């Protein structure tokens, strides 16, 4: 079965959003620091690699770096420039929803990486002892969700549905 270019783009974007929002933002920080629960009680046992305490923050940072590579179309660990999601935005030729949005996303990627760098290992202890600081990092990651999932998808004309809409 052959997919059209638009179908391939939609698959990439949908997968990208699921990985970033569900696995990275929520799974690696939102659940452990408790922001995803009604009581906002930290759940340090949910950090990634709980038995390798010195790696949890590194895994979060590397995950954001991987999403950054996908956004920019970086190949071979950032040494080769291929077509990325940023290129689709720039191709719109619109100052506000193309280049301007790309600039906002680029700035937020830097802010999110800087925020992650402020976390300390072991992350399981950090989310308990400095929960408010971990919430601030989460807020930086959440800002990317809005830029990617709402603004970028809207600019590119992609409809994200959470259930089938085929009419049956």
Task: Show the residue positions of the predicted features.
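Single conserved hydrophobic/aromatic residue that forms the stacking wall/gate
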Residues: 1-12
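Intrinsically disordered, low-complexity polar regions and short flexible loop motifs
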Residues: 15-19, 24
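A cross-kingdom marker for long, charged
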Residues: 24-168
């Amino acid at each position: 079965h052959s997919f059209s270019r638009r179908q391939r783009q939609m698959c990439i974007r949908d997968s990208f959003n699921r990985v970033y929002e569900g696995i990275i933002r929520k799974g690696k920080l939102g659940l452990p620091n408790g922001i995803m629960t009604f009581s906002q009680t930290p759940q340090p046992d949910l950090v990634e690699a709980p038995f390798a305490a010195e790696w949890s923050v590194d895994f979060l940072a590397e995950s954001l770096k991987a999403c950054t590579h996908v956004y920019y179309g970086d190949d071979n660990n950032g040494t080769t420039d291929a077509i990325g999601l940023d290129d689709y935005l720039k191709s719109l030729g619109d100052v506000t929803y193309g280049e301007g949005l790309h600039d906002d996303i680029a700035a937020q990627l830097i802010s999110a990486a800087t925020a992650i760098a402020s976390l300390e290992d072991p992350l399981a202890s950090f989310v308990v002892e400095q929960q408010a600081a971990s919430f601030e990092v989460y807020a930086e990651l959440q800002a990317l969700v809005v830029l990617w999932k709402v603004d970028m998808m809207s600019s590119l004309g992609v409809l994200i549905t959470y259930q089938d809409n085929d009419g049956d």
